[in-house]
Amino acid sequence: MKCCLKWFGIIFIFVTLIASIYVYNKTDGFSVKKIKVFYLQLTQNPWQEQYAYALGKGALPYLFPYFYSAQIRWKWTNVIPKDPASEPYAPINHFWHANRLVDHHYQGGGTPSNDTIYSTAWVHVDKEPVILSHPDMGERYFSFHFTKATSDILDVVSSQSTGKNAGHFALVPQGFNGELPKGVKALKTAQGSWYLLLARTMVKDKDDLKAVKLLQQQYLLTPLSYWGQPQENLPKSREMWQPFDAKEDPLAHWKTINKALAEDPPQNYEKSLMNLLADLHIGPNQNIDTLDKNSKLGLARAMEDGLKMMLMARASIPGGNVINGWRRNPTNAGSLGAAGDYFTRGVIQSFKGISPSIKTEGKYFGRSVDERGEPLHGSNSYQLTFKAGEEPPVNAFWSLTLYGMDTNLVGNNINRYSIGDRSQGLKYKDDGSLTIYIQHESPGSEKEANWLPAPNDNFSLTFRAYGPKPELFEGQWVVPQLSND
């Protein structure tokens, strides 16, 4: 068994080093001097430091979601934000609600949606079930994603999966043998004690915000022991452990990972990997302080260089396949861990997205270049045309959103940040086709209803399909190529 684990470790390290080389080559490039420095680091340091460095850096993409989730959980529950209207802040098992659609005034990046308004909550299910309740949503699209510490999705409550009628849904901890109240449906059994609950609620336009806010106020989280009691009786605790401070301890992030792993232990099929990492005292209930000095030095370097590697990878490896110039998010987004794709899970799904949308709820496509591979620029005139009968196959709606290269929305004279099938006054041609015009200058009054304003600068586009039909998320339907006249 130990022999197999050692070979597994060698292969794991080798694959990660190849990935590191790929990312490094895509960003900084190579030189003889850099190769010599790398070689000297390998040959002059004690073997314990080399081993800890290689294994620690190689394992970081797998372990990163645990660290990142713990950081975000603390921030969103215990750090008072500068702008409470756009930054989450709420007690445990309570919702925070955004109260406005994101526009160009928000400069936090991350390609924010201008179609839906967000609600978030950190759900703790260590002792008893917690019940999610929502009102009748009418014909409005909505979704609640229960996100694990790994950034994979445990379960979803949505207009697509559970229906638009009012409902109650219980997140149940492992080992619970009690009964749920009448009318409460059990979701998949929780695999850990903490979940990020992210809700997306469709907003037609600014005039629709009042109706959405009324719905949001009826999104409730109730621990089973408080079921039937007034909401004001619910505890508003923010008590949890704080991630270790890297300014005080070079091994702080590894200690945060160990504590997070103790709360949400890895799956049984990951035991071989955890047995390997146990050599470095990484894992549930492990103590890095008892590690030898050289291994500690290796882990400290591994965290520093590993985070740099992941930052470079996040910027240069968007993930997904490219068809007609559009790069789509991975088909198995939300379950990358179960698929064994830990690198993409750590770099893209967790580090870049926090809480992904599963394929049956939302499918995203992005691009920043034209059909010739040249960067998109507002001085050019682009058209996206859907032929008659070939509009996006969705059960909910679709949209096209424009972002600056800083991944923020871009201000414009008509305050239009996205365009789609909910946009008022879209004009179809006589043959039934629909063309969207993307450029800096107005395409003319007769085409302005179909105009998505662009800056006089480089930009990127994101196409979103909410409630996609199988032909879309399975790849039979693809977003048309962008033309440049």
Language-model segments: which ranges?
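N-terminal Sec-pathway targeting helices
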Residues: 1-24
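A compositional/structural signature for long, glycine/proline-rich flexible linkers
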Residues: 23-485
